[in-house]
From Swiss-Prot:
The lineage of its organism: Eukaryota, Viridiplantae, Streptophyta, Embryophyta, Tracheophyta. It comes from the Eukaryota. One of its GO terms (cellular component) is extracellular region. Residues 1-23 form the signal peptide. One of its GO terms (biological process) is killing of cells of another organism. This is Putative defensin-like protein 224. It is found in: Secreted. Its main location: secreted. Disulfide bonds join 60-78, 64-84, 68-86.
Length: 106
């Protein structure tokens, strides 16, 4: 009887830990990307742990070819000029405009 109660207590503790981890993971995926304290004015960013913990804009992953995403397990980066990169592949989406002041080099 004592073993049975310990088993149920352990199951309850494990399930609460798993639910907390899942909630934390969901909040990380919805967090916006911050570059040197600056908040970029873009749609919400997705967080793919398979790409070195970087944040990837949704529009970037949508524009990059699916074969590139599948082959490299979402190893896609999106630099400030909105170039989608996957290994040697590069795509410049013409319809995404950025402000010249926002990314001007000093």
């Amino acid at each position: 009887m004592k073993t049975l109660s310990l088993f149920f207590t352990l199951v309850i503790l494990i399930s609460s830990c798993v639910s907390n981890l899942m909630a934390k993971h969901d909040s990380e995926r919805k967090a916006p990307f911050s570059n040197h304290g600056m908040r970029l004015q873009h749609p919400p960013y997705l967080h793919f742990q398979s790409y070195r913990g970087h944040f990837i804009p949704e529009e970037c992953t949508e524009l990059c070819p699916q074969r590139c995403l599948r082959r490299h397990r979402l190893m896609v980066s999106c630099i400030p000029q909105h170039f989608c990169r996957c290994s040697s592949f590069q795509l410049s989406p013409p319809h995404i405009a950025t402000s010249p002041k926002q990314y001007s080099k000093k």
